[in-house]
Amino acid sequence: EVKLEESGGGLVQPGRSMKLSCVASGFTFSNYWMNWVRQSPEKGLEWVAEIRLKSHNYAIHYAESVKGRFTISRDDSKSSVYLQMNNLRAEDTGIYYCSTGFPSWGPGTLVTV
């Protein structure tokens, strides 16, 4: 069974930083691209960042709205993906989810700026 478990959210002041984590299980983590997405009432579901595989040199892509502020990373040995968020803004408020090529979602973690 594929499981994704996000953590690290909370209440943070504008301009501050926060790091989110996601632990995956039930599949070979190192074989899958990983994404962070977020959901808010204002913008709906919004893609945030993507990190590819070791064989792709861990290529990374970001949404324009977070480029230069957010950093995605992964640790295949821990089946985990991370999102370091700096210089947070009110518009970054939302529920953050990690996702991959399965129709499975974790509970998400709420970030309130």
Swiss-Prot record:
The keyword Disulfide bond applies. The keyword Disulfide bond applies. Disulfide bonds join 22-98. Keywords: Adaptive immunity, Disulfide bond, Immunity, Immunoglobulin. Residues 1-113 form the Ig-like domain. It comes from the Eukaryota. PROSITE patterns: IG_LIKE. InterPro entries: Ig-like_dom (IPR007110), Ig-like_dom_sf (IPR036179), Ig-like_fold (IPR013783), Ig_sub (IPR003599), Ig_V-set (IPR013106), IgHV (IPR050199). GO terms for cellular component: extracellular region; immunoglobulin complex. SMART domains: IG (SM00409), IGv (SM00406). Signal peptide: none annotated. It holds the Pfam family V-set. GO terms for molecular function: antigen binding. One of its GO terms (biological process) is immunoglobulin mediated immune response. PANTHER family: IMMUNOGLOBULIN HEAVY CHAIN (PTHR23266). This chain was isolated from a myeloma protein that binds inulin. This is Ig heavy chain V region AMPC1.
